[in-house]
Amino acid sequence: MEAVIRHADLIAKVSAERVRDEFEKIIMSPEPAVGVGMLQKFGLLKHIIPELEEGIGCEQKGEHIYDVYEHLLHALQHAAEKGWPLEVRLAALFHDIGKPRTRRWDGTKAGGKGKYTFYGHEVVGAKMAVKIMDRMKFPRKTADMVARLVRQHMFFSDTEAITLSAVRRVVAKVGKENIWTLMEVRECDRVGMKKKEAPYRLRKYHAMIEEVLRDPISVGQLAVDGGILMNELGMKPGPRMGWILHALLEEVLDDPAKNTRAYLDVRVGELEQLSDADLRTFGEKAKEAKEAAEEEEVLRLHRKHGV
């Protein structure tokens, strides 16, 4: 051990690719927190990722019982225990890496007792993560993914910002395919503070995400649309077209098997024979059915997540 510590600086002579490969093995091991801890103990971490050592002794107070460095190791370990992939583990390890550089003491906080603030640490941390991963020669795709997760990890910490429209925006930023990965990083952050995995708030976030991601219940789901009605069936644009589409929607909501071109083309011909008054009645009934279906789907999601 003493020899390793004494000659730790020699790791600078090892290629970045080799160091990355060995570091990745540690991160993907069952006990990555122990592995990273050993790198620090042997004096190697400061030559590989010195940015992590900036968190040693960097107190956070408030909800946190660990310093930044310890918190990151606990978050990483949770990702490993869950069997989550490399990107999640690296994002867990780096998610608060920008805190030491953004820490400020604000004496006006906590009722005048004062507290540390870390405003913008997610922005600084995302930039740091990219530099670290570029230095270690990680693939660009991996680096970009980790940086995106680090940059957005605070979204689910701000309870005041959690609205359906806000969830839609964050989904747009990270991508539908990555939103659940971001939630995994959020869970790592929470468990890294010695808190339970799935409190009510986290379950509520899951329900809101599913609500945002589910397919909309609208005429856009029909096998025919306004373009088909005009271009192929010769219908003129106007209120009647809208009423017909909503009338078709009501039937499809009752029986999804009817959502085929063959069936709907026939129904369009039949509906065209109706008066404006009858079509309007069909359209209003369809809107009511649509709203009821949406309400039931939202209730189902809330029941599923216990919120």
Where are these regions (language model features)?
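C-terminal accessory/binding modules appended to enzymatic or scaffolding proteins
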Residues: 207-245, 294-307
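Histidine/acidic-rich helix-loop-helix segments that form or flank divalent-metal centers
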Residues: 54, 58-67, 73-77, 138-198, ...
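A residue-level signal for conserved active-site and pocket-lining positions in enzyme catalytic cores
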Residues: 35-39, 75, 125, 150, ...
